């Protein structure tokens, strides 16, 4: 007998439909699986055989052939266990084949017949809903994550025996209800450190506000103890809330990486990733035998904070260049090409020299050559992609001893950030541009118009500082953001001067 079961595999953060075909015929007793399979998929044969035996169902002494199509797609992972088991049971006549139509099945099977959770359920169920499948069968532990998708029925299963009884109407499949799985995505904002806790550093705070308002990359340079890390960790408090579309993209990435839990099945807040400087290029960009998202993809629609930037290996930092330009990570493997979104805001911090105290000659003992060698760890092409560089100085004593100084809270700053972003959304309505930092060079003259007086001012700055074309464009984008924060439709000279 012959049967077909629908399942899927995740490549990048998108789902690819897969058909599991099972054929049970007379012949030599053999259990064979074909279809461009990885080792873990081939191992499903023994897991399914043992699980069925422990559930009271022995495979017949016949030839069993399993084909996973299309054959040109490399299949990997353990999510094929349950669809293979169901396909075999249907071919044996234990499960009615008509119940498998328009049903997508995923799940790993343990030797005792338990259904174990898998990674990437959210993109799989999302694709199934788009393809207008009637229902999806997923492990119970993935049900809350899968239930975020509307327009499709869900069956949560615990054991293989439960699956068999459910298909034969001996029991009813468990369907998570809306109020159980929490379709409500509005959650209380997580407590983060507040900008009001920082005394002094008004110039750096202003730079952070500008950077967040226009999604500009930011580099802070200063001595140890100046507050670079402290300030960076408060940036999440002034980020605007994600839209539902953005949150769904981020949740898909975390689903593929296996970072979602039953208590946190929806990424409601913008990510803040802070990898250590010893991270490998693969850890930053993503990779592995089955390529998965790295830190720069986990920071999608959020902040990637690189502390001690000059301590990262040069080859690791150079990986950032392409994702910062194209806002996605592209990995080429023998099994195919993988693409992960990585539209993040880079915030970096570093010391001006190896000891950290340059140019304070009383404390810095580095030679000029040592300072230059230290700064050369950051390549010029990478620096060209950072819009704002700001110096953090040692906090003055008078700022430290002020009693209850009035400092702006993160909530107050966030209101101005949201207002500036709303102006950008109105300006870029109907285009694929979302932030001032994303304005293409060809459109700068349209969105960043300058008067004759301002052009003369910028010409003098261009010649005096020997700017490159890319640096000039960066100044215009930052000035456009400052003007938005000022509520001005036109870029004024003071905006250019601050930029």
Where are these regions (language model features)?
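P-loop NTPase nucleotide-binding/switch module
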Residues: 171-210, 214, 241-296
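Catalytic P-loop NTPase motifs of RecA-like helicase/translocase cores
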Residues: 112, 306-313, 356
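Short beta-strand elements
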Residues: 18-24, 284, 387-391
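Walker B catalytic acidic pair
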Residues: 301, 307-308, 319
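Walker A/P-loop
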Residues: 220-260, 326
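Peripheral, non-AAA+ core regions of ATP-driven protein-machinery
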Residues: 1-219, 223-229, 332, 471-472, ...
